[in-house]
UniProtKB/Swiss-Prot annotation:
Protein's name according to its UniProt entry: Small ribosomal subunit protein uS4
Matches recorded under CDD domains: S4
Keyword vocabulary terms for this entry: Ribonucleoprotein, Ribosomal protein, RNA-binding, rRNA-binding
Entry keyword annotation includes RNA-binding: yes
Organism encoding this protein: Nostoc punctiforme (strain ATCC 29133 / PCC 73102)
BP GO annotations: ribosomal small subunit biogenesis; translation
The S4 RNA-binding domain, residue ranges: 90-152
GO cellular component terms, semicolon-separated: small ribosomal subunit
Subunit structure: Part of the 30S ribosomal subunit. Contacts protein S5. The interaction surface between S4 and S5 is involved in control of translational fidelity.
Region annotation Disordered: where it falls in the sequence: 22-43
The keyword Membrane appears for this protein: no
Family: Belongs to the universal ribosomal protein uS4 family.
InterPro entries: Ribosomal_uS4, Ribosomal_uS4_bac-type, Ribosomal_uS4_CS, Ribosomal_uS4_N, S4_RNA-bd, S4_RNA-bd_sf
Length: 202
């Protein structure tokens, strides 16, 4: 299944607020489509599926990529759900988004893919790169890159910088101080239901 490129507000209406996908809010509080206002009781499977979809759309992943992250999280000691969120939050595209360099994760991915971001002084154009504590994330020192990011900083996606990051707006340089804590994950999601969804596949 490929990465979603359709109308973003349609997804927000179905799944709720997805801060990584779009800054816009849905005007209508019910899902899209002819039967959007139906109030049928949902099955447990449908609830788990919805939580999984929140992760997939918020972080802009394909089904295969998300399954790979779940399998990776299972191999790490600790809560699988929490490790899964940490893996997704520490991706380079998400880190760029959380630093305020880009208004959304898709916009951050584009900055990374086009070579506007450096890690420890070297250009990294892989959005899935896992950022580690101690690494310095910066905007590439060239006019085009700085102009793009300075425009983005006028309208940051999220107001608060998470505690594991620091950012110098004048130098356009950020640093990863630690792995993100669960309380700083902006997406409202029940990660345990996501793990349950994949329990027979991962």
């Amino acid at each position: 299944m490929s990465r979603y490129r359709g109308p973003r507000l349609r997804i927000v209406r179905r799944l709720g607020d997805l801060p990584g996908l779009t800054r816009k809010s849905a005007r209508r509080a019910y899902p899209p489509g002819q039967h959007g206002q139906n109030r049928k009781k949902r099955s447990e499977y449908a609830i788990r599926l919805e939580e999984k979809q929140k992760l997939r759309f918020n972080y802009g992943l394909t089904e295969k990529q998300l399954l790979r992250y779940v399998r990776k999280a299972r191999r790490v000691t600790g809560s699988t759900g929490q490790v899964l969120l940490q893996l997704l939050e520490m991706r380079l595209d998400n880190t760029v988004f959380r630093l305020g360099i880009a208004p959304t994760i898709p916009a951050a991915r584009q900055l990374v893919n086009h070579g506007h971001v450096t890690v420890n002084g070297r250009v990294v154009n892989i959005a899935s790169y896992q950022c580690r504590p101690g690494e310095v994330i910066a905007v590439r020192d060239r006019a085009q890159s700085r102009k793009l990011v300075e425009a983005n900083l006028q309208y940051p996606g999220l107001a608060n910088l998470p505690s594991h990051l620091e950012f110098d707006k004048n130098k356009l340089v950020g640093k990863v101080n630690s792995v993100i804590e669960r309380e700083w994950v902006a997406l409202q999601v029940n990660e345990l239901l996501v793990v349950e969804y994949y329990s027979r596949q991962a």
